[in-house]
From Swiss-Prot:
Protein's UniProt keywords contain Nucleus: yes
InterPro entries listed in its UniProt record: bHLH_dom, bHLH_transcription_factors, HLH_DNA-bd_sf
The keyword Cell division belongs to this UniProt entry's keyword annotation: no
Protein name: Helix-loop-helix protein ngn-1
Annotated region (Helix-loop-helix motif), positions in chain: 76-114
Subunit structure: Interacts with hlh-2; the interaction is direct.
Compositional bias (Polar residues): 28-37
Gene name tied to this protein: ngn-1
Biased composition (Basic residues): 38-52, 172-184
Top-level taxonomy: Eukaryota, Metazoa, Ecdysozoa, Nematoda, Chromadorea
UniProt entry keywords in alphabetical sequence: DNA-binding, Nucleus, Transcription, Transcription regulation
């Protein structure tokens, strides 16, 4: 496409010729590469105003403060949940506050013991704990001071006051027989 006009500047005519040739080459390549994915154009990077070091530091501080606040809320939520769990688990009145890992392990044992109780199973304590057949007894070796060490022995949360059992029998040591509960 040539423009020979006295009103059309010469330097634009050659530039337009170059553009026309590029377009033709592009069309030829597109027809040859029609099976290939189209080439993505790079995004333009616009220059943005440079921020001062003080502004950058303030932005970093704000981001860090927000992250710290999120982490603090997460930890408070976790601690509240663990405190609630400690309140549900049976414990001796003079027992010191359990650590997080002790609380989780004891909860695991307590759930397993309640499951055994619901299923009507009452495995022999020595057999279970010697063979480790329940899978949890071996995990409880670090918790020998807790009211129950094996899921083989369910622990009640509380006996109703109508029962004649003294409070000292509410908790059982590792190899004692599990109580039988009355059926309602």
């Amino acid at each position: 496409m040539y423009h020979h006009s006295p009103f059309y500047p010469h330097h634009l005519q050659t530039g337009e010729q170059d553009l026309d040739m590029e377009r033709e080459n592009d069309m030829d390549q597109n027809s040859k590469n029609s099976t290939q994915k189209p080439v993505k154009r790079e995004k333009r990077r616009y220059r943005c105003r440079k921020r001062s070091p003080a502004t950058i530091e303030r932005a970093k501080t704000v981001r860090r403060d927000k992250a710290n606040a999120r982490e603090r809320r997460r930890m408070n939520s976790l601690n509240d949940a663990l405190e609630h769990l400690r309140g549900i688990l049976p414990a001796l009145p003079d027992e010191p506050k359990m650590t997080k890992i002790e609380t989780l392990r004891k909860a695991q044992e307590y759930i397993a013991s309640l499951s055994f109780q619901l299923s009507g199973g009452s495995p022999d304590s020595s057999q279970c704990c010697e063979t480790g057949s329940c899978g949890l007894c071996s995990a409880s070796q670090s918790l020998q001071s807790t009211p129950f060490q094996s899921p083989c022995f369910p622990q009640p949360l509380q006996y109703p006051s109508s029962y004649s059992n003294p409070p000292s029998q509410m908790y059982y040591h590792h190899h004692h027989q599990s109580p039988s509960f009355p059926h309602h």
